[in-house]
Amino acid sequence: MQSVNELCEKGNSLLEVGMYQEALSCFKHALEITPETYDYEDERVWILVAIGDTLFQLQQYSNAMEYLRRAYFYDPGNPFINLRLGQCELESDCILDAKEHLLKAYMAEGSTIFEGENLKYLQAIKRLIRH
């Protein structure tokens, strides 16, 4: 039986070669075997974010939001969680929620958090700020 760390490492390796469904399977299995106790909260948040991010890459925004919202519950100040959650909300036409989360990410990291992301997200937050 693989450990949580082994499953997460395997998931990351699969992501690097574009095998998103396989990576998702690894991350979900890791989440299943991670205890739901305070001692494992950081690990659970990391895995929830990995699942949400993978689903985002697969353009499964609604499913991604489910996992990212769970991660957000534990770590609402995390800029990356706010970024991904806001992106998914924007893609799902949840504009007010998207504005809140993208703005939190932007306020924490500035425009650098949007580097490597589709330019439409930075443009969206700038547009949303003006309105």
Give the residues covered by each predicted segment.
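Alpha-helical linker/edge segments of TPR/alpha-solenoid repeat scaffolds
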Residues: 50-60, 91-101, 123-131
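Alpha-helical adaptor scaffolds
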Residues: 16, 20-21, 28-74
